[in-house]
Each structure stands twice: as structure tokens, then as C-alpha cells.
From Swiss-Prot:
<dbReference type="InterPro" id="IPR050081">
    <property type="entry name" value="Ile-tRNA_ligase"/>
</dbReference>
<dbReference type="InterPro" id="IPR002300">
    <property type="entry name" value="aa-tRNA-synth_Ia"/>
</dbReference>
<dbReference type="GO" id="GO:0000049">
    <property type="term" value="F:tRNA binding"/>
</dbReference>
<keyword id="KW-0648">Protein biosynthesis</keyword>
<keyword id="KW-0862">Zinc</keyword>
<dbReference type="InterPro" id="IPR033708">
    <property type="entry name" value="Anticodon_Ile_BEm"/>
</dbReference>
<comment type="subunit">
    <text>Monomer.</text>
</comment>
<dbReference type="InterPro" id="IPR009080">
    <property type="entry name" value="tRNAsynth_Ia_anticodon-bd"/>
</dbReference>
<dbReference type="InterPro" id="IPR009008">
    <property type="entry name" value="Val/Leu/Ile-tRNA-synth_edit"/>
</dbReference>
<dbReference type="Pfam" id="PF00133">
    <property type="entry name" value="tRNA-synt_1"/>
</dbReference>
<dbReference type="Pfam" id="PF06827">
    <property type="entry name" value="zf-FPG_IleRS"/>
</dbReference>
<feature type="binding site">
    <location>
        <position position="939"/>
    </location>
    <ligand>
        <name>Zn(2+)</name>
    </ligand>
</feature>
<feature type="binding site">
    <location>
        <position position="629"/>
    </location>
    <ligand>
        <name>ATP</name>
    </ligand>
</feature>
<dbReference type="InterPro" id="IPR014729">
    <property type="entry name" value="Rossmann-like_a/b/a_fold"/>
</dbReference>
<dbReference type="InterPro" id="IPR001412">
    <property type="entry name" value="aa-tRNA-synth_I_CS"/>
</dbReference>
<dbReference type="InterPro" id="IPR013155">
    <property type="entry name" value="M/V/L/I-tRNA-synth_anticd-bd"/>
</dbReference>
<dbReference type="InterPro" id="IPR002301">
    <property type="entry name" value="Ile-tRNA-ligase"/>
</dbReference>
């Protein structure tokens, strides 16, 4: 290059200033840790949160919040649950509904009690009075509520934060006692001796919902032979007919005939009261040749038992289970006898021997069988899981530790042990202490589910369940469940308002006493049960007799607490609906809150407390594992939002990415979350943000009131884009209505990436940047972009609420609404819908995709840089595509709907003679694509290759089109 040429290059005018470049205050980066709190403050200042929903004029919508436990840091389960609720609430707010959402907390129970006790020394614990413990527990729970509340707010959750419900509030406690009283008066509450799930580690009864069932618990299972001392005459005669004659002498018979049982709880053998059989099963009398004994087993299990015991049997007789009733046997550990009785359908041939060791004090089926056969409910185990003196030589042994070993040893010494084997199975554990539980018969308070079971099953049918499988799940649970043990032997809870007569243990629990306690709790709270004596707790009519009565010490199950929320919250606030429109919790709540709420509501009012129930799965790590400290795989939502100590490995994504995750997953099953998933979500978030930024950046000089182009006068490409936007609005609306948020996620991603960025905006760049500012074709595109950005902000607002508001605040022209949430939900205008454009444009887009694939190959081979360096020739064999191109040519705007510009090439030829020099000629399903180097020279302003470059001496490096624009500026 000569000196003169170089000087000429330097003196050329720069055309950058003549282009319409992006201008927007909407940042490329979200800067979420700063910007999101700013937007939340904006909402709070303007009353644009739940206040907006309450001010709406539409129909009411109440999502009743299932109360999280007021203990511990927020985790991904909280995030999944609360964000799902918030997405639904925000959608209803945008639809103009009067939305009610009162956040709640479950504040009573053992975990909080234990947390308080852990802060005290042994001396302080011993000196602690019940009321002191309650005060400390209440303070602890209140502190936890405050911390969790701030976390929920940071996630962008809207709710009535100024008036949440807490199960420790006096108005809640009072309403719960009222509900309890209504169940008492209907005859559904009773006190009885019954085996319940008992936690020795917590020293209290547990409800089914308070249990976990780890898979790998190992129990010592034993096969035991009980010595028979008496046979019913009819059975003896039947055996003789089959050739089996047994001794009539009791001692000799006991040596010869054995009843064989199998149990995984050897520690319950001291409480054995019977052996149960199934009346419909066949049983075999088999000879143990080595010992000369006759053993009784279920016929179907003979082969399995023979293999396990390593003994060869010879069948010598058989009998129906019904005929075994009345056999008497000696207890192998004590000097007492017990009968064989008929049990229920729970006795099967799935495992064991078909004869079931029955201890009514240690099992529900055993208890029921005991009632039918007048068996004693014997339970020689105390609240710590220690054998009492009633267990004889086993007194003082822990039933879950050393008792099994000692009992098995005693069985072996007595000659009763046939086999001991470890048995791995599911076993109930205390969900709080993570330690095994037992069945233990104690005096407890129960809700008689049997009294309203059929009503509950009918109520389930009247509810809409999402997914539908939830209906069968809760129906089977309610159908099969026993009575509900509602009493707990702890201090931190709502007391069961009962009085016992000191001498007789007579129970005092009637409308007068319950009403009095209800009123006291409403005035003072439940603490007065411990602060007042009986003279004040009893109604005035009984105060003079208070010295004869003693108040109870049991508290209510926390599931009764939370299951009363419909009565304590929904029915106490006039604005809230009962039944609620929606309950939404994890799938584990079919046996928890959904069920406890259902049972209390049906018992009192005969219907469910909800119209619709939606359930979600659990949050797992990326490998599908449950999160735990031991695995080191816990994902902390706070770290997702604010970042970790190392921002490179744990960047601050902000609340919207967390919310986007919730919308991206199929929440009806367990859902994964991890660093790789977050990176992918961040990319999607960034794509939506950058697409929005591009739209905003091209509107800096646009005023819809002055510059809009009438929709009927828009080019075909713009009309198609509005039609596609209308389709997306309708599809996303339907997805939200059906709570299919992952469908929203897919539609949003496709709309921003495929429809906008890769197609419409890619084509629009030329007219946006290169045209004169007021060029009609640019104004047409800006008209469409303005319409889209306003709709897009509304569509993403339930999920990406912060981004939606940020977009709204950065729209450069005047809007009549100060917030996107005041605009309301986007609707698709009828004049946007032009179905006739869908098929031809789809065919052309398909062709464009094929062309881009061939151009990309040229770029990869370094034959081309920009696609504008290419010329394109097409041979099209598909008539539908030819018709589409012809439709565009005849009906389109020549300046915008020129198909050459849609392919972003400098020349286009359809059909005609092949070009002499080509880079590639490639067949595809619709014809042939031929790529060559573009003819002409590159325009320095628009970068198109044209043959009229240099025709204007004033602008020798510009094409004719750009010269025209420059002359207008």
C-alpha cells in the first residue's frame, strides 16, 4: 500500500455515527444482588405486591399456605414450594383476581423443644419449669420465623407478611381448641389403651406422618417353636383319620408337637398372648426326622422354611387354619399358656411360617386380633424403651439394644430357637431424632377416623388432584389408616383441655369446659394452662370443686395443629375462602398436612378444606440423590442468589434464576438441581435478558403515539411476528392456567431464541441499523418490537418477576402503568392473528435453516466470513415452498419482505442457469443450495456486496441504498 493510499484510507469518513445503534439503560448484566432488592423496595413503596392483588376487582383466589416448620435454614425444598405458590399467585394477580395468601408457620413440637434444651446445662434443664420452657421455645420459634420470612421475601415471594399465621398465636390456639371441642361433641375423640408408634428417643407417641422408613434397617429375625400342650378334640380326631396320633398327656404332647412362628422383633416375645392363623390357609403337620417332633407350618411355605432352617420335613397331615383355633401352647420364656386364635387377612404366605406371634400391646393388627379374642393388652416396656419388672428376668434391658440378644439366648437355652437370621427391611424411625421407634400400648387420646372414614373418602372424590395419581394415593391411605393418635407427652404444644378426677381418673371434657378454655386461650394464649391452676381453668360452675380435679399434661400432635389451619386461619378471616381454592405442598403431605386437614374438616363440616390439591416432588442433587450433609451435596438457595465465598465456583445468580429453575422442571416428580443445571439456566436467563435488551435498545427514539405504523399496513414479516407472538401468548396463558410451568419455560426459551433472535431480529438488524431513523420500514419494526416487549414483560412476570419489572422500568417511552403488574395479563389481540401466514413462513424458515447450515459449513472451511459475502442460488423442487416464495413476492413489502434479505446474503437467484464459480452445491430435501462468493464490492456502511459501489463520488465506498440514506440525514 502506497503512502497516498494509506492517507486516503485514514481520511475516509466514518459511517458509524450514521447508524442507529442500541441505546438503553437496561444493563446487559442483571447485577441481581443489587438490582433485585431495589425492585422489591419499589414494589413495597408503591404497594405493588399482594396489596395490588387484594385491590383487584376480579373473583377471589385463595392459596392456603401449608406452614413450614419454624426451625432451621431455608433449603431447596422451601424454594421449590414457595416459588411455585408465588408463580401461581402472581399469575392470578395479573389476571385481575383478588388474591389472598397468608404465609404460615408451624411453631410447636419436639424439634424446637430440643433446640431450647440443647442451649441449657444439665442443672438448668433440671430447674426448668414447663412454662419457662414454653417461653424459651416461643422466643426461639419467633426468631426462626423472622429469619425464614426475610429469606422468602428475598426470593420475591409476595404475601401478607404483616399478618402471617403462627400456630403459637393465641387466636390460632383458641380456634384449634374450638375445633377439638367440636370433634369431641360429635363423638370422634376418645381416650384408650392402644399400641401406638412410640419413640423411646423422644419419649412420646408419634403419628404416621412423623415417621421415616429407611430401607437398610437390620433386625434379628428368629424362627421359634412353641410347645403345644392341648389339642381341640375335633382337630385331634381329624389328625387320627390322617394317620397322625399324638399323645394325650400334656407333658408328652409338649415334647412332640410344636407351633412355629417367625418374628423380626424378638423383644416383643415377653408380651406374647397368642399365635394367630388365617382361617382360610392350609396348614401342614410335618415330621422333623432328627428330633422326632411334629412342626406346624403354612403349607405354601414348607419349601421355603425347609431351605431356611436346613431341615428335611415329611408332611404327615394337614388342616385348615380354622380348625387350629383352640390349640394351647406353653410360652417359651415364662410359666404361662396361650391359645392359637384366628387372625385377619394380614396373615399371608409372603414370608414367615403362616403362624403369627401376637402381642396386642405391640402392634395394631395384634391389638385388633386381641380385641376379637379377649386377649390381654400386655406391654412391659416403659417410655424409655426399657423393660419393666413385668418382663421378669429381662427387667432393665433396652428393647432396641440389648434385649433382643438376651431373649434370643434364652430361647436357645430353652430349646425353642430354630434359627436366627439378620433381616434387612424398612423400619419406622423418628423423623426428628433419626432413631428407631417401637409399638407400645399406652393410654392416649385418639380421633376415631372410623366414625367419618366414608365421608372422608367421598370428600376426596370431590377434590381436583394434580397430578391425578394423588387421589388414589390419599384414598388408599385414608381407607387403610387406623384411628389417629393425637396426644403427645411433651410440653411445647397446645394442651388437650381435659381434667381427670383425682381419685377415680374420671374424665371431664364437655361443651362447658371446652368453651371456657377456648375463651381463656383467646384472651391469654395456651400458656395459661401451665400458669393457672384448676380453679381458674375450670368454668365458674365447677370452680368450687376444683380440688377434686387435675388438669391433663398431654399436648396435641403437631399435625393436629397444622391440620386445624383451615379453622384457625381461613374461617377466622372473612376475606379468606373456605374451602380454599388451592393447597400446594410436597407429595409427602398426602400422609401429612393434606390428610390431617382433610380429616379435621370432614369430621366437623363434612367436606374437604380445599377445592384443588397440587403436589410436587423433592429437590435432589444432579445425580438424583437426596441432599445431605454427609454426602456434601447440599445446594443452598442463599448461595444461588448471593453467591458463595468463591464467586468463580459459586456465582451470584439472583432470585430470578432460582425462580426460573422452579419453572423449568416437571415438579410433579423429584427434581434435580446442581451447578451444571444452574449454568444452563443462567444461559437461558441471559438469553431472555439479552433479547429484551435488544428490543429496548432499538426503541430509544420511538414513541408509539407518534411513530407507530398501523398493523394492517405492516410488512408480511412483521405481521407474521405479531401472529407468532399472539400464538405464544395463548400457549403460555394455557400453560399457566394448567399449572404446566415447564411448558412456559420451553415456550419462552423457543420464542426468545428461535422466533426472535435467530429469525425475526436477525433479519431486522439491517433495517434497524442502516435505515434512516424515520424510515417507514424501521418504524414498522419498532412498532412490532414495542408491542412485543410490553407483552413479553407481562408473560415472564409470574416467574422472572424482577426482570419483568426491570424491563418495564427501562421502556424508554411513556407508559400509563407504573409497574408491569399494573398492566395485567397479556392478551392476544384479534388483529394480530393471521393464520394464513403460518404455513408459507414456516416453509421459508425451514429453507432458511438449510441455507444457514450450508453457509456455516463454508465458514468452518474459511471460505466465507459473514453470510453477506455470499451469493445464493436455489433450485427448488417442492411446490409448496415455491408457492410460499411466490406468495411473499406478490403480497410482501419489497423493502422488507425481500427474501434475499431474509437469508442475509448479498445476492439471491432462484432457478436459472447454474453459476460458473461456486463454493459448494448441495442437495437437500427441498432442492439444491448453491453458494458462491458475492459479486461486487462491500459497502462500508451496511456491509452488503453490491455492484453500484463507487457510483457516488461523495460516498465512493457506499452502495446506492446507503447513499440515499446519507443524503436524507
Amino acid at each position: 500500500m502506497t503512502k497516498e493510499t494509506r492517507q486516503g484510507e485514514q481520511n475516509r469518513p466514518s459511517y458509524k455515527e450514521s447508524l442507529n445503534l442500541l441505546k438503553t439503560s437496561f444493563g446487559m448484566r442483571a447485577n441481581a444482588t443489587l438490582r433485585e432488592p431495589e425492585l422489591q423496595n419499589f414494589w413495597a413503596d408503591k404497594g405493588i405486591d399482594l396489596e395490588l392483588g387484594l385491590a383487584n376487582k376480579g373473583p377471589s383466589f385463595t392459596l392456603h399456605d401449608g406452614p413450614p416448620y419454624a426451625n432451621g435454614a431455608l433449603h431447596m425444598g422451601h424454594a421449590l414450594n414457595k416459588v411455585l405458590k408465588d408463580i401461581i399467585n402472581k399469575f392470578h394477580i395479573m389476571r385481575g383476581h383478588k388474591v389472598h395468601f397468608v404465609p404460615g408457620w408451624d411453631c410447636h413440637g419436639l424439634p424446637i423443644e430440643l433446640k431450647v434444651l440443647q442451649t441449657l446445662s444439665n442443672k438448668e434443664r433440671q430447674a426448668l419449669t414447663p412454662i419457662q420452657l414454653r417461653k424459651k421455645a416461643a422466643a426461639y420459634a419467633s426468631k426462626q420465623v423472622k429469619g425464614q420470612m426475610e429469606g422468602f421475601k428475598r426470593w420475591g415471594i409476595w404475601g401478607n407478611w404483616n399478618k402471617p399465621y403462627l400456630t403459637l398465636q393465641k387466636e390460632y390456639e383458641s380456634a384449634q381448641v374450638k375445633l377439638f371441642g367440636q370433634m369431641v361433641l360429635k363423638g370422634y375423640i376418645y381416650r384408650g389403651l392402644k399400641p401406638v408408634h412410640w419413640s423411646p428417643s423422644s419419649r412420646t407417641a408419634l403419628a404416621e406422618a412423623e415417621l421415616e422408613y429407611p430401607e437398610a434397617h437390620t433386625s434379628p429375625s428368629v424362627y421359634v417353636a412353641f410347645s403345644v400342650i392341648h389339642l381341640p378334640q375335633s382337630l385331634s380326631e381329624n389328625l387320627i383319620k390322617q394317620g397322625l396320633e399324638l399323645p394325650g398327656d400334656e407333658v408328652e404332647l409338649s415334647k412332640r408337637l410344636k407351633v412355629c412362628i417367625w418374628t423380626t422383633t424378638p423383644w416383643t416375645l415377653p408380651a406374647n398372648a397368642a399365635v394367630s392363623v388365617n382361617s382360610n390357609l392350609d396348614y401342614s403337620f410335618v415330621r422333623h426326622e432328627e428330633k422326632g417332633q411334629i412342626l406346624i407350618f403354612a403349607t405354601e411355605l414348607l419349601e421355603e422354611v425347609s431351605e431356611i432352617l436346613g431341615i428335611s420335613f415329611k408332611q404327615v397331615a394337614n388342616a385348615k387354619g380354622e380348625s387350629l383355633k383352640g390349640i394351647l401352647y406353653k410360652h417359651p420364656l415364662y410359666e404361662r399358656t396361650a391359645p392359637i386364635v384366628l387372625g385377619g387377612s394380614y396373615i399371608t404366605t409372603q414370608s414367615g411360617t403362616g403362624l403369627v406371634h401376637t402381642a396386642p400391646g405391640h402392634g395394631i393388627d395384634d391389638f385388633k386380633t386381641g380385641l376379637q379374642n379377649n386377649l390381654e393388652v400386655f406391654c412391659p416396656v416403659d417410655e424409655k424403651g426399657i423393660f419393666t419388672s413385668e418382663a421378669g428376668k429381662f427387667e432393665g434391658l433396652n428393647v432396641l439394644k440389648d434385649a433382643n440378644k438376651e431373649i434370643i439366648s434364652s430361647l436357645e437355652i430353652s430349646g425353642s430357637l430354630l434359627k436366627e437370621l439378620p433381616y434387612v427391611h424398612k423400619y419406622p424411625y423418628d423423623w426428628r431424632t433419626k432413631k428407631p421407634t417401637i409399638f407400645r400400648a399406652t393410654e392416649q387420646w385418639f380421633a376415631s377416623v372410623e366414625g367419618f372414614r366414608e365421608d372422608a373418602l367421598k370428600a376426596i372424590d370431590d377434590v381436583e388432584w394434580l397430578p391425578e395419581s394423588g387421589r388414589n394415593r390419599i384414598q388408599s391411605m385414608v381407607r387403610e389408616r387406623g384411628d389417629w393418635c393425637i396426644s403427645r407427652q411433651r410440653t411445647w404444644g397446645i394442651p388437650i383441655p381435659v381434667f381427670y378426677k383425682k381419685n377415680t381418673n374420671e374424665i371431664l371434657l364437655n361443651k362447658e369446659t371446652i368453651d371456657h378454655i377456648e375463651n381463656l386461650f383467646a384472651q391469654y394464649g395456651a400458656d395459661i394452662w401451665w400458669e393457672f391452676d384448676e380453679s381458674k381453668l375450670l368454668p365458674p360452675s365447677l370452680a368450687s370443686e376444683s380440688h377434686h380435679w387435675q388438669k391433663g399434661v398431654d399436648t396435641m400432635d403437631v399435625w393436629f395443629d397444622s391440620g386445624s389451619s383451615w379453622a384457625s386461619v381461613s374461617c377466622q378471616r372473612d376475606e379468606l375462602g373456605y374451602p380454599a381454592d388451592l393447597y400446594l405442598e410436597g407429595t409427602d403431605q398426602h400422609r401429612g398436612w393434606f390428610q390431617s386437614s382433610l380429616l379435621t374438616s370432614v369430621a366437623v363440616n363434612g367436606h374437604a378444606p380445599y377445592k384443588k390439591v397440587l403436589t410436587h416432588g423433592f429437590a435432589l442433587d444432579e445425580n438424583g440423590r437426596k441432599m445431605s450433609k454427609s454426602l456434601g451435596n447440599i445446594i443452598d438457595p442463599t448461595v444461588i442468589i448471593n453467591g458463595g465465598t468463591n464467586k468463580k465456583t459459586d456465582p451470584a445468580y439472583g432470585a430470578d434464576v432460582l425462580r426460573l429453575w422452579v419453572s423449568s422442571v416437571d415438579y410433579s416428580v423429584d427434581v434435580p438441581i446442581g451447578s451444571n443445571i444452574l449454568k444452563q439456566l443462567s444461559d437461558v436467563y441471559r438469553k431472555v435478558r439479552n433479547t429484551s435488551r435488544y428490543l429496548l435498545g432499538n426503541l430509544h427514539d420511538f414513541d408509539p403515539k407518534k411513530n407507530s405504523v398501523d398493523i394492517d399496513n405492516l410488512p408480511i414479516l412483521d405481521k407474521w411476528m405479531l401472529n407468532r407472538t399472539a400464538e405464544v401468548i395463548d400457549e403460555i396463558t394455557l400453560a399457566f392456567e394448567k399449572y404446566e410451568f415447564s411448558r412456559f419455560f420451553q415456550l419462552l426459551q423457543s420464542f426468545c431464541t428461535v422466533d426472535l433472535s435467530n429469525f425475526y431480529l436477525d433479519i431486522a438488524k439491517d433495517r434497524l441499523y442502516v435505515s434512516a431513523p424515520d424510515d417507514p420500514r424501521r418504524r414498522a419494526c419498532q412498532t412490532v418490537m414495542a408491542l412485543i416487549i410490553e407483552k413479553l414483560a407481562g408473560l415472564i412476570s409470574p416467574v422472572l418477576c424482577h426482570m419483568a419489572e426491570d424491563i418495564w422500568q427501562n421502556i424508554p417511552y411513556q407508559l400509563s402503568e407504573e409497574s408491569v403488574f399494573k398492566r395485567g395479563w397479556p392478551v392476544s389481540p384479534s388483529n394480530w392473528k393471521r393464520a394464513s401466514l403460518t404455513e408459507p413462513i414456516s416453509l421459508i424458515r425451514e429453507l432458511r435453516t438449510s441455507v444457514n447450515r450450508v453457509l456455516e459449513g463454508c465458514r468452518n472451511r474459511q471460505e466465507l466470513g459473514s453470510s453477506l459475502e455470499a451469493g445464493l442460488r436455489l433450485e427448488i423442487t417442492n411446490q409448496g415452498l415455491l408457492d410460499a416464495i411466490d406468495f411473499l413476492a406478490k403480497n410482501g413489502d419489497h423493502d422488507v419482505d425481500c427474501i434475499r434479505d431474509w437469508f442475509l446474503v448479498s445476492q439471491l437467484q432462484i432457478g436459472g442457469e447454474p453459476w460458473a464459480e461456486v463454493l459448494i452445491s448441495q442437495q437437500f430435501e427441498l432442492g439444491v443450495i448453491e453458494i458462491s462468493n458475492a459479486r461486487g464490492y462491500k459497502c462500508e456502511r451496511c456491509w452488503h456486496y453490491e455492484q453500484d459501489i463507487g457510483s457516488c463520488s461523495e460516498h465512493p465506498t457506499l452502495c446506492g441504498r446507503c447513499v440515499t440514506v446519507m443524503n436524507r440525514l
